Amino acid sequence: MHTHRVTQQDLNEAGAMAAVPTLLQQCIPRGTDIRVTIIGDAVFPVEIITPPDAPVDWRATRKGLRYRLCAIPAETERNCRSLLAALGLVYGAFDFIRTDSGDWYFLEVNPAGEWAWLDIELGLPMRDALIDLLYGNHQSA
């Protein structure tokens, strides 16, 4: 299941949505999708550059996607680490949207989110971070 825009027709047929788990949120203006993966002590923030005709949810198709490392605000990293600590986790894949005006929107954290394709695409040391985590060579997120 991927994110998609809810139409007026969807709302008119809202009874159908009652049969399945549904999460609704305000539509956030498209900006830059950012995946921040935290593995133990290591933080890997990556911009996901989508083509103009990409679906709302970049995960629906990876056709035409490009990736690059990016910086994230220190407060955002602290908040991610605080959330992991509160949840008792040492791994999390955080998804954000950064609007063109520079506002950051937190979408979700996935405690089992995918990461390997970014390790391969960008040559990141994510596997090494996971090995360190599994062997106990880390502090806590």
Which residues does each PLM region occupy?
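Hydrophobic residue at the +6 position relative to the catalytic HRD Asp in the kinase catalytic loop
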Residues: 94-96
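C-terminal active-site "lid" helix and adjoining low-complexity regulatory extension at the edge
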Residues: 71-74, 85-89, 98-141
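A conserved acidic, glycine/proline-rich C-terminal tail/linker
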Residues: 80-84
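Protein kinase-like catalytic core scaffold
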Residues: 23, 44, 92, 105-107
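Catalytic cores of transferase enzymes with a strong primary signal for eukaryotic protein kinases
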Residues: 22, 78, 128-129
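Phosphate-binding site of ATP-dependent enzymes
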Residues: 1-72
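Short solvent-exposed loop/turn micro-motifs enriched in small/polar/acidic residues
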Residues: 28-31, 76, 89-91
